[in-house]
Amino acid sequence: MSSTENPDSVAAARELEALRAEASALRRQLAESPEQLREMESRVDSLSIRNTKLMDTLKEARQQLIALREEVDRLGQPPSGYGVLLGVHDDQTVDVFTSGRKMRLTCSPNVDAETLKLGQTVRLNEALTIVEAGNFERVGEISTLREVLDDGQRALVVGHADEERIVWLAEPLATVYEDSERESIAYDAESPTRKLRPGDSLLVDTKAGYAFERIPKAEVEDLVLEEVPDVHYDDIGGLGRQIEQIRDAVELPFLHKDLFHEYELRPPKGVLLYGPPGCGKTLIAKAVANSLAKKIAEARGQDSKEAKSYFLNIKGPELLNKFVGETERHIRLIFQRAREKASEGTPVIVFFDEMDSIFRTRGSGVSSDVETTVVPQLLSEIDGVEGLENVIVIGASNREDMIDPAILRPGRLDVKIKIERPDAESAQDIFSKYLVETLPVHSDDIAEFGGDRTACIRVMIERVVDRMYAESEENRFLEVTYANGDKEVLYFKDFNSGAMIQNIVDRAKKYAIKSVLDTGAPGLRVQHLFDSIVDEFSENEDLPNTTNPDDWARISGKKGERIVYIRTLVTGKNASASRAIDTESNTGQYL
């Protein structure tokens, strides 16, 4: 520095230099600030996300702590007891049966004593206070109702060991009984709200002394089918005379009670339909129930569509039970149900199919004498102290000779109608029920009659019947030799039935369907029916196999002299060589 320089100038220069440096620094800071701002914003966002995650974690941990605390509290609770409510008092105390003793307890504030129902299950805390009301008990012992006592709140029941006890009716059962008594309601048998009746099975808690529920008797429900059959007399062919007989026996007494009373004529209590298998015995019984319901509806001025009747179809062999007295009990329950239905003025038909399997002649059993008690039970039901008003018994059997004579005497099964095998005229009537004009018929067959479908089907039926009933070589079936030495040739027509005719028509329809698939030509032909007859006869060739040919002959409708020798005479399609059997020396091979 020169000695001539001014000190003030030097100071000013230095200050200016400092200001320039500061300005430069500010310029650099201003240039860097946007990048720092973005960095700071990014850090803020990151911290915010982290903070949110931490908050969620804390909330989840808090919820887990609360759940764990509740679980600890729940595990630490003392056990609860259960009891059956016996009664409610005005002071909000209740009587409860619990732990084998009757106790008077109080209700917690959360339970309204007035809403509790007798017989209801309640939950008790450690202080024996009612804290919750539950449902009615659903498990227990089954007892049979003997009678409901006059107060309508108690009942006399019988347990398994025939022990009688008085039990309270839980509120649902008591309410049903009171309503039915007050309103005189005839509840339906299947309704859970129908009136209690003797013989009902009840769910009972013998310790608490309460009956909770009516349990359907499955063993009886399986044996009895309540229905209004949709079968008409027009559906039955070839049995006009038998239908008239059963209508006179069943329908007239129901429809003209005043005339029967005027002439002092007692209506029949029962009808026996007997004859070979597959000839329409069950169909007739069902048609009777349907026709009777419609006739009574018309007499009362009701719509025939609303006609009501009951057809109790008893599965005969299943009625038998290995336990002593069970079969008799089932019979009592069946007739009890029939009387209840009939009390409404509705006709009830009790139909015993295969009657010989249940009510065979007493003393004829080989390994069992069950018939010695079952037969008297039926007799007592038919003509016992309790009448069978509006109830008629119909039995069906193909071995009427095995039914106990006491059942068949007048006053029990009064009317006996034989359902015979169809003759040629009856067979035409039966065929007409299955070969109807709505069926597709082959155009060639219709063309033979100038396009007259009705005439074609009529002639088709006549040809088929002629083929079935011709006493020709190809229709021979058996040669039987009787004990007196007489011989007789039996043809397939001697074993025809309505069921066989239906099967022949069904076979022919199947052949017609196969013909459509093979040739494309639709329609039923006479040849289809002829082929079906041959197949049906050939299949029946080997069917009459039994260890007792005389029994088989009786079932098939051939009664009379005892058969001692049988020889087959089948010569149709696929027929094997004739076979013979001497029934005296060999009883287990063919017939």
UniProtKB/Swiss-Prot annotation:
Pathway: Protein degradation; proteasomal Pup-dependent pathway. GO terms for cellular component: proteasome complex. The keyword Metal-binding does not apply. Keywords: ATP-binding, Chaperone, Coiled coil, Nucleotide-binding, Proteasome. Residues 590-591 are annotated as: Docks into pockets in the proteasome alpha-ring. ATP binds at G278, C279, G280, K281, T282, L283. Residues 8-77 form a coiled coil. GO terms for molecular function: ATP binding; ATP hydrolysis activity. It holds the Pfam family AAA. PROSITE patterns: AAA. The keyword ATP-binding applies. GO terms for biological process: modification-dependent protein catabolic process; proteasomal protein catabolic process. ATPase which is responsible for recognizing, binding, unfolding and translocation of pupylated proteins into the bacterial 20S proteasome core particle. May be essential for opening the gate of the 20S proteasome via an interaction with its C-terminus, thereby allowing substrate entry and access to the site of proteolysis. Thus, the C-termini of the proteasomal ATPase may function like a 'key in a lock' to induce gate opening and therefore regulate proteolysis. Consists of three main regions, an N-terminal coiled-coil domain that binds to protein Pup and functions as a docking station, an interdomain involved in ARC hexamerization, and a C-terminal ATPase domain of the AAA type. PANTHER family: AAA-FAMILY ATPASE, PROTEASOME-ASSOCIATED ATPASE. HAMAP family: ARC_ATPase. Homohexamer. Assembles into a hexameric ring structure that caps the 20S proteasome core. Strongly interacts with the prokaryotic ubiquitin-like protein Pup through a hydrophobic interface; the interacting region of ARC lies in its N-terminal coiled-coil domain. There is one Pup binding site per ARC hexamer ring. Upon ATP-binding, the C-terminus of ARC interacts with the alpha-rings of the proteasome core, possibly by binding to the intersubunit pockets. Belongs to the AAA ATPase family. This is Proteasome-associated ATPase. It comes from Rhodococcus jostii (strain RHA1).
